[in-house]
Each structure stands twice: as C-alpha cells, then as structure tokens.
C-alpha cells in the first residue's frame, strides 16, 4: 500500500442514523484521519456518533433549517457538490443514495462509490413520489426530474468504480447508469445477546417512517389479526401511522442500539413489508435469532432464507402479510434461533471493512 495517500469520505447528508450512515461509520474506522464531506450535518446524528470526526459541509448548511428542509433542496444539490474542491485527495470514497457521486475529483484521483441505490426519486420510485406529492409539486416535478435524470447519468460517469450493496442494486446501476458494479453487502452489527428460545408475544418492525417502507401494511395486518406489534423509529409519516394504529400497536420511538436489540431478541418475528435495496434490519433481526417475515422482492431475497430463517409474502398487501403471519404461526421456520443467528454472520462489520479495504488497495493503492 502506498504511503501518504490522501483520502476523503463523501456522504449525501448526515442528519439521521440509518444503514447508509452505518456504512459511512465503517469507512471512518478504515480511514479515521479522512475528512467527511456532506451536504448538511446535524451533530445529534447517531446520538453524536460523528461529533469527533472532521465533518465538512457545503454552503447548503447555511440555509436556515437546512437539516430539516434538505430533502426539498434537490435542484440545489448538484451545484453544491460540484463546488466542493477535492483536488488535494488521491482517493475519494463515497457513500451514495442521491447526488454525492457527482463530486469532481482530480483526473488522476480514484473515486470509488458505494452505491446504496440509484437516486430513488429520479428513477424507479419517481411515480410513487409523484403520486403522494402536493398539487404544486406535481406541476413542477416532471420538468425538474427530467433535468435531474440527465445530470444524474452524467454524475455516474464521474465514478471510477461502483460498489453495490446488493445484486438487486447492481442490476439497477446497470439499467440506469450502464455501469457494472461489484456487490459488497453492507455491515451489520452482529449482537452477542443471549438468545431466547421462547420469545414474547409480539411482532417487531424497525424503520424510518416513510411511505416506501410500507409500515401501513404491517399496521393494517396486525390490526385485523389483533396481533401485538412494536414499531421502533420515526419520521414524516408518524402522524398518519399513529392515526391508523389500533390498540395492539405500540410506538416505541427512537431507541439506542442496546435497547433495540432487547426488542429484537424477544420478538416472535420481525416484519419487513417494504421493498428495500438491501435492508439491514432483517439481518439485525436474524443476528438476534429472530425469524423474518418479508416482502419477497429486493434485497430481502439475498438476506433471508425462505422457510429456514424466515418466510416471504409475494404481494405487497395487508392481506398477503396476514396470510404470511398465519402461516408462520402454524408452521414456524426450519432453523432454530441459534442457526438463524449463524446465518447472519456472513454480513458482519469486520467482513465489510476487509472487503472495502481490498477494493481500495486494488484500485487506489497500487
């Protein structure tokens, strides 16, 4: 490995803690001296997890309430990223689900992009976003998104090497950007809590409260079946979801990792009704020995073993999830909780760091 290589880390925005931010944290552990460039930054992200890091923001940070309104700044993001001067760095490692792949590097520098997904609201989820948009946004979005699609493809061409977080996303990268990508599964903290063989009588869901996660399906299914459901997380749709929840639904809010793992360990099963690019939470659940009942599309097909560590439902409806819950209660899954945890070991944080380091050594340090 060459010495004196200057490395920069790049991330779309650093506001809430999710799977993408956990990837960024592993990048930081690999390159602790590297600054982190991001559009906007909330120092409370991850309970202050990044407060000792060298975090550098764009001019968007100066806009009042930027950490609340950043999602409405889509048309400003390309300019903000392109104005960053990264010419002093030999290697740029980006964690991208939006626009940060569009940073401009030195001609002889290497930009490795860990792509969580091609920009959702520009490509495959565009019509879902449009369907739920206000009248004004419905009027403005088509022309705006058309321009963003052109820029997004240009931005993808600036990347030297793509890494995808699943084979599912590698296919999307190929479709929208016409680029190949190597799959490296995201890091998952494999908990070491003692397993319980007799779980408590509740189902669990851990998620941000946004539409495409389809938490509404889980609530409707558990309402109709009168099953206990604990929901951990928060977000834009919280008011709507609370309004539809019946007496068997509990909202636990945002919890730290230790509190959350207690819920994973004791849950009867984990519900995963959304179509995700990868989906870290089902692996976290399996690391606690908890079976997963998942919508059978997207990344879940690569992390859950149907019939062994969980069950799939094939239609994204409350009725289909209800049938899956009833099937699980009638027949269970093949693996016991110890073997379910063993399956999760192939997604560990150490494995992730080793694979990322190998890529960096191959493309940037030779």
Q: What is each model feature region?
A:
Residues 188, 194-230:
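Conserved donor-binding/catalytic core segment of Leloir-type glycosyltransferases
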Residues 239-261:
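Nucleotide-activated donor-binding/catalytic signature segment of Leloir-type glycosyltransferases, i.e.
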Residues 254, 262-267, 356:
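Short alpha-helical donor nucleotide-sugar binding micro-motif in glycosyltransferases
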Residues 265-277, 290:
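Acidic donor-binding loop of glycosyltransferase active sites
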Residues 271, 291-295, 304:
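Short hydrophobic beta-strand element within catalytic cores of glycosyltransferases
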Residues 306-307, 311-318, 326-333:
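Conserved acidic donor-binding segment of nucleotide-sugar-dependent glycosyltransferases
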Residues 316-319, 332-361:
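A charged, aromatic-enriched C-terminal amphipathic alpha-helix characteristic of glycosyltransferases
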């Amino acid at each position: 490995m060459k010495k004196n290589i200057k490395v920069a880390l790049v991330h779309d925005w650093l506001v809430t803690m999710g799977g993408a931010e956990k990837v960024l944290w592993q990048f930081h552990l690999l390159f602790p001296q590297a600054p982190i460039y991001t559009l906007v930054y909330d120092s409370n992200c991850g309970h202050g997890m990044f407060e000792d890091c060298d975090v550098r923001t764009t001019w968007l940070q100066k806009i009042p309430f930027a950490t609340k309104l950043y999602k409405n700044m889509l048309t400003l993001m390309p300019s903000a990223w392109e104005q960053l001067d990264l010419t002093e760095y030999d290697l740029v490692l980006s964690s991208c689900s939006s626009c940060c792949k569009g940073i401009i590097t030195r001609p002889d520098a290497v930009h490795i992009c860990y792509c969580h997904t091609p920009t959702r609201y520009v490509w495959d989820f565009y019509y879902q976003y449009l369907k739920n948009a206000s009248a004004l946004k419905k009027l403005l979005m088509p022309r705006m998104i058309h321009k963003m699609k052109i820029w997004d493809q240009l931005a993808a061409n600036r990347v030297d090497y793509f890494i995808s977080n699943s084979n599912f996303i590698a296919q999307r990268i190929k479709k929208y950007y016409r680029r190949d990508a190597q799959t490296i599964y995201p890091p998952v903290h494999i908990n070491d809590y003692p397993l319980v063989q007799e779980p408590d009588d509740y189902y669990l869901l851990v998620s941000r409260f946004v539409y495409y996660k389809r938490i509404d399906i889980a609530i409707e299914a558990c309402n109709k079946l009168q099953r206990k459901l604990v929901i951990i997380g928060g977000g834009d749709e919280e008011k709507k979801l609370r309004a539809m929840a019946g007496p068997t639904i509990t909202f636990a809010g945002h919890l730290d990792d230790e509190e959350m793992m207690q819920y994973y360990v004791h849950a009867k099963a984990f519900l995963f009704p959304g179509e995700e690019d990868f989906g870290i939470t089902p692996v976290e659940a399996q690391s606690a020995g908890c079976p997963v009942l998942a919508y059978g599309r997207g990344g879940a097909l690569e992390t859950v073993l149907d019939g062994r560590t969980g069950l799939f439902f094939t239609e994204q409806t409350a009725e289909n999830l209800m049938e899956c819950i009833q099937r699980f209660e009638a027949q269970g899954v093949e693996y016991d909780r110890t073997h379910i945890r063993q399956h999760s070991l192939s997604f560990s944080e150490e494995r992730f760091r080793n694979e990322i380091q190998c890529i960096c050594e191959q493309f940037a340090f030779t």
